[in-house]
Amino acid sequence: TAPDPTTFRDAWRILEQYEVARKVPASVRRRLEAGMKKTLPETPKAGAVLFRRVDNLLIGDNQAAVDAVVKAAKGKRLQTLVLSTTVTGEARELAKFFGAIAREIATHGRPLARPCCVIAGGEPTVTIRGQGKGGRAQEFALAAALEIAGLPDVWVAGFATDGTDGPTSVAGAVVDGETTARARRAKLDLLSALQDNDAYPCFKKLRAHIVTGPTGTNVNDLYLLLAL
């Protein structure tokens, strides 16, 4: 439905960049090599005949989702701050940043005074270190719970706009300053769970999941900090 500007050689360069070109299945390697030798056709590019009567219209994006959050927050008379609509990097590192902002708000009333809502959109990643179950939004929330532990009237949430975070049936999770205390009472070790990338079981037991079901759209994720 849309031209693909990438090539077989682009894919091969990425494999080489991460030093996995000789580790992928032989069938994948053979296909890429055939494409680079032009014995396999590239995907359709801009200017191809089949696109002459095709128009692609972008009717929604992460900016639209963030704008909707801002509108809803202002409707509740909250001050708002949008950090970015293109966040990337490790989900747990993003959580540390949100935690630092939460503590700055709680301690000094900046960059916003309460009541306020800090918003970011995008799609961070997770480097798999363990054998657990979860997704980037749940990993963000799990790490954030550790960062905001003890802060009163502060909530942090992360969720995927398509309603599916990683290989799970939930969109994400929401935590507050008391999440770690509730976890201890439930005999859950959140730090160990984070190290094992095992956010899903923790939030299931704490009943902290955000469950929307399939939303019919996908404009990356939303990450929120609410301080009242």
Residue ranges and their predicted role:
Residues L78-T125:
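Long, well-ordered mid-to-C-terminal structural blocks that present hydrophobic/aromatic surfaces
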